[in-house]
Amino acid sequence: MPDPNELNANQSSLSRFAFNIYGALNQAQSLEGNSSASPTPSMNPKQHNKSGTSSSNKEKLVYNCEREVSCISQFNHSLNGLVKNYEEDPLHHLIIGGKNYLKLLAMNNDQTKIVHEVDILESSKSIYSSSRTLSSNKLTSVNTIESQHDTIACELATGLISVYKVQNNGKCKLVRKYSDHIRCVNSLDFINQSNVANSSSPYQLISGSQDGTIKLWDLRSASNKPTLTISSNSHSDPVRSCQYSPHSTVRNKLTILSVHDSGALCKYDLRSPNGGYQHNINVPERKWNFHTGPALSLNIHPEKEYVITGGRDQKVCIWNYGDSPTHQNKISPDYMINTYGPVMKIRWSVYPDNIPSKTDTSSSQYQQILESKRYDDKTSSNERETISTMSSVGKNDPLFNYDFACSFLNEDPTISIYNLKRKYIPKEVISSNSNKPFQNFMWAQNISHSRRVWTISKSNQFMSYDLDTAQSDPNIIKPLDNLTSVSMAWNSGLGDFCFVNQEKDEFESISQLENDSFRSESEEYDPEFALASDGSGLASNSGMEDHPTDERSLKYRISSNSLDNSSIYNNHSKITVASIPIASNASNTPLSYQNPSFSNSVSPPFEQTTKPSLHRSATHNPMIQPPKPLSSILQNRSSVGIEALMEHGNNNSGSNSASVSGNHLRPTLNRNHSQSTQGSNVSLSSSIQGYQAPPPVSKRVISVNHPSPYIVPLSLPLPQNDEHAFEILSNNYLITVNDGLSLIDVCLYNANIAAGVNKFRDCQTWRVLAVSLEEDKFSLINYEENIRSQFEKAETAITYGSLDTYENNSNTSNSKTQLNQTNDNRSILSELDNFVGSFNSNSTSTSNYGGVHSEKDTSNNIELSNANNNGSRKASFSEIKPLSNLNSPSHLKDVLNQSRSNSNSPVISRSNSMLLKNRKTINTGSTRAENHESAIDDDDGMGNAKTCELNENDSQFGMKNSELKKHSSMSAIDSEAIDNDFPYNIESAKASPIKIGSQHKHEKNTTSGSMSPQNKDSNHRGNIINYQRRLSLDPENSRKNSRNAFNYRHTNTWDLDDENSNIIGNRAQWATNSSLSSCGVSSYQPRIGSPNYSDQLHHSYSSTHSSPRPYYNSTTPGSSRRNSHISPVHGFHNKTSYAKQSPVSQKLMRDEQSRTELKDVQEQIEDLESIEETKVTSVNFGKSELTRAITGNNTGSPNTLYKPWKTEYLLKEALEFASLQGDILLCSILTILFYDYLKVGKDSHVFSKEQSLDWLSLYVEILHRKQLFSNAMYVVNMAPKELLPDLANLASTEVNLRFFCCWCQKLLVNEKSKRKALNEDSFGYWYCDECSTKQSNCIYCDEPCKGLNIVTSLSCGHRGHFGCLREWFIDQENIVCPGGCDEQVI
């Protein structure tokens, strides 16, 4: 099981690979290697063993130095007098130098142990103690060490160079000291014709110093002066590194390369034309400027004239410094690699990759597979030739066979190993064991020829790393193994969507397409290399070393290389267009590696038949005409035949002179290796007369038979990828709540914007969020009102209990008339309460069912509303306008508009619990009005018909009483005001005979819900009831006073979803229970969820239906009432008649009655707090569950109640869907708007802070990609404050700009001017140090153009400041250049 910490470190390291930023793994590992007896802060010297090794990795060597060390080198000389008891003398040892520190560490053969230590400083003192000059060993700091054979040279920070000789027994002596340099020496190198370990001792030494000079020293001379000095005439450019080139001796030259602080690479030839050496060289032979900053290191390739340089500009450049004219005229490096940090040191590997080591099994296994296939009887001759070429292909490209390593500045504890085959990703990354930066490193020579790196870190620790056994070393990581082989991108410029694919074992190499005459002068002709480069089937395989080891891949390669035209030409019936190889060009192929032109192909040297052209990568040659397109041939396919198709696939000449039918295939010519000439490079199918020798072209290819890496662009018709819609939405969406708007208004506005670009789902999402926000707003208001109403319950009950105003109020005739309002435009279907039809539907308006609704009613309602508004602000039912039709499409919109218009009204801001409490108190108050009631005497001679009419009027009053209950959402004061306005006319009461009836008769007949003739005395009503009866008997009077009536029906709650399927049964049960309630009996309904719900429901139902059927129809229009377990006459005392008491007694009884009723109210408060049970049993009986939940669940806290339509739940679903669909725009806009609303990071579960940051950063990146920079900046500025710091860091990107001189066209580095400029002065690229001229001033103001505010004219080339040119062209409306050149720009 891998370590999770290690996996996290690996994943974090992959982020450095973006934009060619490589390296990784800042991880500290425990020290598990062997060490010397040197004391360190983390290790005890007594616990170390000099020759001990780590138990986990026996190949790893660790040594801790006593002092600060800074440089390292390898001593390749035998120490047989010091190291004994070995079959072979160890030849490779270690030298470490530092501050007053210079040691030689002798190793065993496999370099896993340090067997002896030699202090060079102490040894040299004992030998030359009598010498006054040579015994001075007051070292300060060893800066560089170089060794060859038995000679060691070290240079100090003071400029002193010391040369030592080492004997076989380890004794050292100081032989030379050179002190001609005046500053620190940065580089040393020996000059020898044969740079091998067993050669004779070197006799020449070069040194490069910070004083800007390179000096040549003759070790054989007794003089301490240099033989030759190289310096610059213009200025002293410090030399960072210099090296002798061993490859230039073939041309009898002595070449030295150096890199300087100016970033220049200089090439010097020390030989004079007359022989010998030049004494002083001031001008280099060649000079290249590859780096924009100081170049810090260089190293020459072991086999070819290529040099690699690294600098502070985070670039690695590879350049051919040979004398070939092809390379002399180049101004850019052959290869350039971007690194993630400034390069401090860079070195080529001493061994190529194709040399198998003892631990390398993949290479040997691959060779075994090749050999087994080569001598297999089933293998054809063509396949054998292919295998033979593939076996030798690895040693034909030395530039690609060598790795190179680089270390970095800025405290980076890594060393990256690269190869040009996969130059953008390092092969290995070495991390420091102590998490300290590396001070120095080198490639170590060893007898096993393995890739081994020696390092020293700033923790003064030496460590050896074997890259061939990296699997067992936790400090060596291969990033390529952790990367995917497929990458993709949206809107990359090639298409809506594109992806790049490349196998991990496919590496680059160089193959020359041309003949041998165009090779570099320094290259010797290699027949095998010519074979690989000239063969069309093998050109793509040159330089291949990392072969796949599986047999299936090998079989694929062999079969791909052995294709011939016989399968096409002999099977004419099976030929298809897809099987014909077609040349691709730059116009129709989006690949960075295009297929080669067919005129460059040559015949394979090992085949007699013509092969079809293989699809391989090459550089397109514009000098050669492409072949005729296939489409023109296919149009004439019927007349031309199959021969034209064959010619199109094999005719590589590109000649347009011959017709399609006229050119026939020419016989194939065998080409021997010795016959490689310029003329033999002609294509087989081309015309000799039209042949022209192509210019020299080289190409970089992949070692496979298909283009690699290849890119696949796609154009996908995705609605979410609409560029026009994206731009409109990003420009017009509101992402902040402006002044005068609310979040609801912003959502509705964004909904209209989304609908404008046919984003209807997004439009609906915004609208739903707007409705949910409004619902949350009213829920919060109702909750706050409920909290405040708890303190008014007792006072409200007392207020409604004291109804003395009924006795003294004589101005209530108009209010009395209002209770008789029954003229509402209800349809017959509305009897089912929205089961079918609408509540206020006018579908039956022609029948005038339910009475005629006159226009005067509306006017009177408006007058009453205005009258109420003139006085103190009291809620009246006329303030709420009834809706016309619930089934209309605009019903929901009307509901939303009405709720908005009345959001400040206390009528709609009350909770349902308050409705019940106020309704109960109103019922209680209505019973107290019976202190002065009079019952209708049954002795007045009224018949049964009249009694029935009276009972019907009672039913109508019961309806009105129920309507009053429905509208008891008013405050206590408002309800009291309406109760005080109830009509009580004494004169009208005396017009009819009254008599106080017996209450016992009433109780006996309450279950029937009707009034029989024998029980007409038992209906105990007051003056209000009598007045109602008289109005019902006088229709004219009813119509006369109906204009003052209230229209209460609009406050009913409606079933918006129309899903109550059992409404008929509920209405039947409600009718019976309502009749019971109208008679003063509490009809108890069982509560849903109670333990005895089933039994109680059965008992209630059976007791209700066992009674006689009522005389009148309870479902008569206008008699709709809500059932309640609280009786309308709750608290009414039996056998009590206030009319027979004295006024004082009546007053006392009323007060006592009020106190009793107050006690009863307080006892029932708990029952009324249970909203869900109360709604089911009393308030919302007959509604669906969804309607009850929407309209009634308002008593709890809005934050604790679960409502699926709450904003946070709807927003969560919308964000999840948008993120799955890839709609980053919607996710980002919702995040900005609702981040503070949901309090993300505190108690929100909709989205996290990390998700918000990801959405916004990706949205800003997309805006940058689409060049909507102003929108991106606006999004960053409007982001939540918590995300703004992180988002600003992600959105900001560094831009590297290079400026070139407008006169000499050279790069403006200006290092010299920078050093002269003061720290407080701002330095701009307006002056060129190379040509010592100032750049062009602004053409308008004639001031220097500094910074980025420069605009260049498209035609005349003049430039100026942005503000100046804007003033000239826009403000002054000019169209020509302000420089007077009369060039029309606009």
Swiss-Prot record:
Annotated Gene Ontology cellular components are: cytosol; GATOR2 complex; vacuolar membrane
The subcellular localization recorded is: Vacuole
Record's compositionally biased regions (Basic and acidic residues)? 1148-1157
GO molecular-function terms, A-Z: zinc ion binding
Spell out the residue ranges that the record assigns to WD repeats: 180-227, 234-278, 290-329, 382-428, 1171-1212
**Where is the stretch described as Disordered?**
31-58, 595-629, 647-691, 844-958, 991-1021, 1090-1157
Swiss-Prot/TrEMBL GO biological process terms:
positive regulation of macroautophagy; positive regulation of TORC1 signaling
| PROSITE patterns on file | WD_REPEATS_1, WD_REPEATS_2, WD_REPEATS_REGION, ZF_RING_2
Spell out the protein name for this chain.
Restriction of telomere capping protein 1
In its UniProt entry, the species of origin is given as Debaryomyces hansenii (strain ATCC 36239 / CBS 767 / BCRC 21394 / JCM 1990 / NBRC 0083 / IGC 2968)
